[in-house]
Swiss-Prot record:
It comes from Mus musculus. Adaptor protein complex 1 (AP-1) is a heterotetramer composed of two large adaptins (gamma-type subunit AP1G1 and beta-type subunit AP1B1), a medium adaptin (mu-type subunit AP1M1 or AP1M2) and a small adaptin (sigma-type subunit AP1S1 or AP1S2 or AP1S3). Interacts with P2X4. Signal peptide: none annotated. Transmembrane segments: none annotated. The lineage of its organism: Eukaryota, Metazoa, Chordata, Craniata, Vertebrata. InterPro entries: Adaptor_comp_med_subunit (IPR050431), AP2_Mu_C_sf (IPR036168), AP_mu_sigma_su (IPR022775), Clathrin_mu (IPR001392), Clathrin_mu_CS (IPR018240), Longin-like_dom_sf (IPR011012), MHD (IPR028565). This is AP-1 complex subunit mu-2. The gene is Ap1m2.
Amino acid sequence: MSASAVFILDVKGKPLISRNYKGDVPMTEIDHFMPLLMQREEEGVLAPLLSHGRVHFLWIKHSNLYLVATTLKNANASLVYSFLYKTVEVFCEYFKELEEESIRDNFVIVYDLLDELMDFGFPQTTDSKILQEYITQQGNKLETGKSRVPPTVTNAVSWRSEGIKYKKNEVFIDVIESVNLLVNANGSVLLSEIVGTIKLKVFLSGMPELRLGLNDRVLFELTGRSKNKSVELEDVKFHQCVRLSRFDNDRTISFIPPDGDFELMSYRLSTQVKPLIWIESVIEKFSHSRVEIMVKAKGQFKKQSVANGVEISVPVPSDADSPRFKTSVGSAKYVPEKNVVIWSIKSFPGGKEYLMRAHFGLPSVETEEVEGRPPIGVKFEIPYFTVSGIQVRYMKIIEKSGYQALPWVRYITQSGDYQLRTS
C-alpha cells in the first residue's frame, strides 16, 4: 500500500531529487527506469507502471520532469498516483511553474516538502495551505523556526478544528454494501461484485482518537493468516484521517475523525454472490395481438431478513397498450415513458416467492422492434445485513477528558447495478 522512495528525474532520466522513505529498495534501482521506459516506447506499449524484477515504478510526467515512486509491495496504485499528482500541485503553488530549473533553484524547499508530504511511504500532509504556514519561500532560502507552528500542524489534523463541544457525545456508523449483478438470459451470473463503504456521523467533543475493529473474517484475510471463510477486500481506500502506517503494521483502523459526516473507508469484493432476489420471467409476444408477461421473484437471503422498497422493472414493447396486472403481493404499474412495468413490493421476507402477471395489447400494425431487449432491473434495501459478513467488532473512543460516548452501528445491503437479461 505504501511507496518505498520518490524520485524527480530530468528529461534524460537523471535524478534531480530523491527521497528514500523505507530503505527496502536500493536507490540504484532508478537507473533501470529510463531504459525500461524507452524500450516500452519503442514497442508502442507504454504503461504508467513499469517493473524490473521485484521493483515496480509508478510514474507520471509533468513538463520536462518525471516523478517516479518505487515499491516492492502490491501497492495501492491509485493512492500512489494521487500522491504524485498532488505533489505536482503543491510544487506548482510554491514555484508557479514546475520544471527542471525550479527544482534546481529550490532543492532545499523541495526536500522539506517531500519530508512533510510523505512519512514512511504514506501520504501525510498534502494540503498546500497548511504546508505554506510553516514552509515558506523567501528567495531560494527556507524560513523556519521564527514563527510559531500553526495549530493545524500541532494537532496533526487539518480536517478537525479545536474547541468542538457536544452535550451528548455519539458516533453513528453505517456499513453499506451495494450489490452489482448481471445475469444472462440462461441464468448464468456474468458479473458479481460488492461495493462497500463505512460511513460515520461524528458528534464528539474535543480531539478524540477512535479505533475501529472489524470481525476476524476480514482481519485474518488481510494479514494472510486465514485460509477459508474469509473476506478478501480489494481496492481498500481510507479517508486521510486514518493512520495508514499503523494499519499497514497491525490492521488497526486508528484515526482522529472530522466533525459530522464523512466516509471512513470503501472497499470492493469480486466474489460470486448468490443473487439475493432471483427473477424468472416468461415474456410471450403474440403477433398483432398481445403480450403476456409472467415474472416470479424469490428472496434468496436469510428468512429472518426482510428486503424493503423492492422495485422490479420489467421491459415491455414500446407500442404496448391497455395494461392489465395481477400480483400475489404488492402492486404493478405501467410507465409508458420508460416502456417498463414497475412491480413494487413494500416488504419482501427472505425465502418467500411471489408472482406477477401482466397483459398488454398490441396494435394490428407492428412497429419495427429494436434489436435486443433491455434487462429486468431490481432495486431493494435489506437492513441489519451485509452480504460479505463484515461486522464492526468494537469502536473505542479515547479523549483526554475521559467522557463516555455511545457508538451506534447500522448495516445495510442494497442493490447497485442489478440486472437480469431476458430471452
